[in-house]
Amino acid sequence: MKRLFIISATSLVMFFTTPTQAQQNADSMMIQTILQEEVSSWNSGDAQVYSKHFAENGTFTNIRGMFFTGHQQFLDRHVEIFKGMFAKTVLQQDVVSFRFLSPDVAIVETLTWITGFPKGGSPKAIHIDEKGRLHTRLLQVFQKQAGDWKIVVYHNVDLKPDTPVPTHK
């Protein structure tokens, strides 16, 4: 009887945890796809695609500390920078931290670097290293809304000259 109970309990645990792990893996892949889309759309200067996963009521802070609310402001700001100071730049990013706070909320922090600024054309008051790279730390909070992952918080800060920067891959 005791053996039957242990087998039954183990089976129930496996039954209820396997779909959760499988779902978390699927959600992780969906978020990873969004991160890859961010890079490819930035590199092609496509603000529409770059902004498509940003929530209607999302908030974001850019590298200058300016705060914005809403999808339209996020889109408008990226249209502006892709035509201006970040035109034809190249974004790369490495995931530093990725964790789920709940089945519907994930936090992703990336170390980013941007290259391709024209000589003397980098953004004012932002540190560009000796190799012409702007380094930032980007924290994004994702929330699952109606089955889709949306960015509800986007907080980007530039790394100051005395901040150690890990070696890029």
Segments predicted by a language model, with ranges:
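N-terminal hydrophobic alpha-helix used for membrane targeting or insertion
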Residues: 6-7, 98
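A beta-strand edge to alpha-helix "cap/lid" segment located at domain peripheries
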Residues: 23-36, 40-52, 59-169
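Bacterial N-terminal signal peptides
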Residues: 7-15
